[in-house]
C-alpha cells in the first residue's frame, strides 16, 4: 500500500493494483449468501452452488482472472482430505524421477504441498514461492469444483486427475484435521454438529457429493482428459494405479524402468509410512516457503480406510450412505472402482 501527501499536508493512501483487485472481489463477496461454519466466528459464503471461506473465494476469482494454464500442465484435483497429499507426492515423484537420485529426492526434505501449488491459494496469494518461479514446473493442484474451474484450465486442454474417498472417512479426516488448525475463529463444533453440517453440504468447498459428481460427469464426457480415481482402491493396491497415472500424465515407465523396479520405488517413496516418518513432516515443523496454518505433521494422521467406524454411530453412517446412494443413483459412479 502506498501513500502520498497532498498540498494541504493530508495523507492519501493509495491501494496497490493487487489490493484494488482484492477489494473488488471482497465487495462482490459481501453481496453473496452467508452461513455460519464449523466454528463460532467462521462465516461461509455460497457461490456457484458451493460454500467457501472468503479468502478461498478471493483466490478463486484471482485464479479465474489471472491463471494461465498451458496444455502441458497437469492438475491434481480433489476435495479436501481425500488423498490430496499422497497424490501430490506421486505426481511429483513421477514427473521428476529422472532428475534426482533416490537419496536426493526433495520429497525427503520438504512437504509435498510445497511442490504442487494450489491455484486458488499459492498462485493467488504467494506468487513468489519457488515452485511458481519455476516455469518448467507442470504441476498444479486445486480443490475448486469442476464447474467453477478457471477458463484457462478448461480451454487449455491440460490433463487432470481427480481422487475421491468414502464420505464417512472424508468427514472424519477433515474434522480431526481442523482440530490442528491455527484458527482465530473459535473452537471447532462438536462431532455431531459438524457431521450434521457436512451431511447438509455446509462445509468448505462443499457439498462434498456434488463436488465428486461434478468431476465424475466431466470424466464421463472426456475420459482422455480426466483420470478418475478412488482412494480406497488405490490404497489397497497402489502399484497398478501409479503406473496408470504415469502413463496418463505422459510420463509412462519404460521397459528398463519396469525391470529396475522404478515404479515400486515411487510407490515406496510416496507411501504414507515413508512420508509420515520424515523429519520434515514431524512435530511442529512447517513449510518454509510461505506462512501456514497447519504443521506439516497435520497432513499425516492415519491414512487408513474405515477409520470412521471409530467415530460414527451406525445411525450416522447410515445417514451418509443413504445420501450417497441417492446422489449417485443411476450415475455409474458407485460401479466405477478404479
Curated annotation (Swiss-Prot):
Free-text tissue specificity from the UniProt record: Highly expressed in roots, stems and mature leaves. Low expression in young leaves and flowers. Barely detected in siliques.
pH dependence: Optimum pH is 9.0.
Entry's family note: Belongs to the sulfotransferase 1 family.
Residues binding 3'-phosphoadenylyl sulfate, per UniProt: 81-86, 165, 173, 231, 301-303
Name of the protein: Cytosolic sulfotransferase 16
The gene coding this protein: SOT16
Activity regulation: Inhibited by phosphoadenosine 5'-phosphate (PAP).
Functional note: Sulfotransferase that utilizes 3'-phospho-5'-adenylyl sulfate (PAPS) as sulfonate donor to catalyze the sulfate conjugation of desulfo-glucosinolates (dsGSs), the final step in the biosynthesis of the glucosinolate core structure. Substrate preference is desulfo-2-phenylethyl glucosinolate > desulfo-indol-3-yl methyl glucosinolate > desulfo-benzyl glucosinolate > desulfo-6-methylthiohexyl glucosinolate > desulfo-4-methylthiobutyl glucosinolate > desulfo-3-methylthiopropyl glucosinolate > desulfo-singrin > desulfo-3-butenyl glucosinolate.
EC number: 2.8.2.24
Listed GO MF terms: aromatic desulfoglucosinolate sulfotransferase activity
Subcellular compartments: Cytoplasm
Keywords: Cytoplasm, Transferase
Main location: cytoplasm
Enzyme class: transferase
GO biological process: glucosinolate biosynthetic process; response to jasmonic acid stimulus involved in jasmonic acid and ethylene-dependent systemic resistance
Entry-linked InterPro entries: P-loop_NTPase, Sulfotransferase_dom
Substrates-to-products reaction catalysed: (Z)-desulfoglucotropeolin + 3'-phosphoadenylyl sulfate = (Z)-glucotropeolin + adenosine 3',5'-bisphosphate + H(+); (Z)-indolylmethyl desulfoglucosinolate + 3'-phosphoadenylyl sulfate = (Z)-glucobrassicin + adenosine 3',5'-bisphosphate + H(+)
Coiled coil spans: none
